[in-house]
Amino acid sequence: MKSLKKFFALCLTLALVLSLVACAQKPAEDPDSGETPDTPVQETEAPVTARIAALKGPTAMGLVKLMSDAPSSANGPLYDFTLAGSADEVTPALIKGELDMACVPANLAAVLYNKTEGAVQVLAVNTLGVLYIVENGESVQSLADLKGKTVVAAGKGSTPEYALRYLLSENGIDPDADVTLDWKSEHSECVAALASGQASIALLPQPFVTVAQSKIDGLRMALDLTEEWDKLDNGSALITGVIVARSEFVEAHPAAVGSFLSAYAASVDWVNANTADAAALIGEYGIVDAAVAEKALPYCNIVCITGAELLEKLPGYLSVLYNADP
């Protein structure tokens, strides 16, 4: 019950954040309209340098065009970007106020919200699902085909397990009785098991799928878990990453937050439309090898989802996580 209350509180917080950002993006009153505002016009918000972190991987890929453009004002750069190797490098800095925004896993956003009692809030979804069932063979054409099979995977007790178990259950498959889930410590162990022939089916995220395909002849993406989730048609979505911000920063600099979201959306559009050039930047920033990025990008589901669509998709996904690990 406690987790459920926190979940609904998170939904309300999302609504508050979106209203703040929307207000920041409203156009100014037309001075020629003949209308006199009831209150004095506020001065334009002074430019501020937003400190933004992202984890190396798909959740950082949509940022590369914005990072490369390095927009600035008379006061200096608008953004100070940091790329981190793990969430452990980002979480303390965000809580201490050393960062203003961050691209993090969706489940971590919920943890941060609860841990800080609302001091960290969600602004946007930036990555949908990146999980795939891969197979060295042709036996798996649907989730039902996993019955009686062994699937090697990493991420027990986290999103990969919760997402797979949820999808199996929703498709009438008992994940404990109908499928053998062989959990490994790292995704690289799953790739090794496939390469050695010890396993023929695995659950892997991008870009590990692309890396595995480069090493194993005939390995194919049998099932896209994002598509399987969408088939449920329940209004939610399989979500990998979100953009979070400190509540204090959002309240103090709503225009800066609104401008960042607009710039980020444009960066995402460019990345998705210019795969080769985007992959080169991704490699240049050390996020993922450029050759791997070019092949993986079309399957990484890089997005910028805000507004009503965010309020529809994210709570439904988080509810699945809470039900799996209340």
Protein language model annotation of sequence segments:
Residues 1-11:
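Bacterial N-terminal signal peptides that target proteins for export
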Residues 61-69, 88, 92, 96, ...:
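Solvent-exposed, polar/charged alpha-helical surfaces in well-ordered, non-transmembrane soluble domains
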